[in-house]
């Protein structure tokens, strides 16, 4: 429902590699949603045609709402400013692979998250994943007004990690 070439092509490729067929929607403008159908009802109909649904939507909480009406698994490909767990999994895999090249792991690393941390759904999901590791120091670098939401900071803090909030990058 939210356009993204990379998300659409990567999920399509993954489904094809798993031996499944891909059925794509053409966006919200030409869907029953544009005529007032609820996400729940749309999910009920789409799940009758699919083995699984990968969904990307511009509204927060939309993927969870869709999943309540769906009878098949729903994969969150991004829901508004909330989450993007599949991208976070890919980012985590990339971080692990790069650190493994140097025979290091994620535990005890110093990780900087930089940019729009308030609306950056990928960093929300990645921060939650990183909570499962040990002794990480997070530097959260964002301008005032775009700092990480408090519920993410609370999750990181409750996992026992150190947090440094910074409003700009400083050169040496």
Task: Name each region found by the language model.
Residues 1-13, 97-172:
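Glycine-rich phosphate/diphosphate-binding loop of Rossmann-like nucleotide-binding domains
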Residues 4-96:
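Phosphate/diphosphate ligand-binding glycine-rich loop within oxidoreductases
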């Amino acid at each position: 429902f939210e356009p993204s070439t990379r998300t659409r092509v990567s999920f399509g490729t993954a489904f094809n590699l798993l031996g499944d067929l891909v059925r794509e929607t053409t966006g919200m403008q030409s869907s029953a949603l544009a005529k007032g159908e609820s996400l729940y009802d749309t999910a009920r109909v789409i799940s009758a045609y699919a083995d699984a649904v990968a969904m990307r939507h511009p509204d927060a909480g939309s993927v969870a709402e869709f999943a309540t009406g769906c009878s098949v698994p729903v994969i969150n490909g991004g829901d508004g400013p909330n989450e993007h767990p599949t991208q976070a999994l890919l980012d985590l895999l990339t971080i692990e692979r790069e650190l493994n090249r140097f025979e290091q792991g994620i535990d005890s690393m110093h990780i900087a998250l930089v940019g729009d941390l308030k609306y950056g759904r990928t960093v929300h999901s990645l921060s939650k994943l990183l909570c499962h590791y040990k002794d990480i120091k997070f530097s959260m670098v964002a301008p005032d007004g775009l700092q990480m939401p408090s519920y993410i900071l609370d999750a990181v803090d409750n996992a026992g990690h150190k947090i440094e909030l910074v409003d700009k990058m400083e050169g040496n």
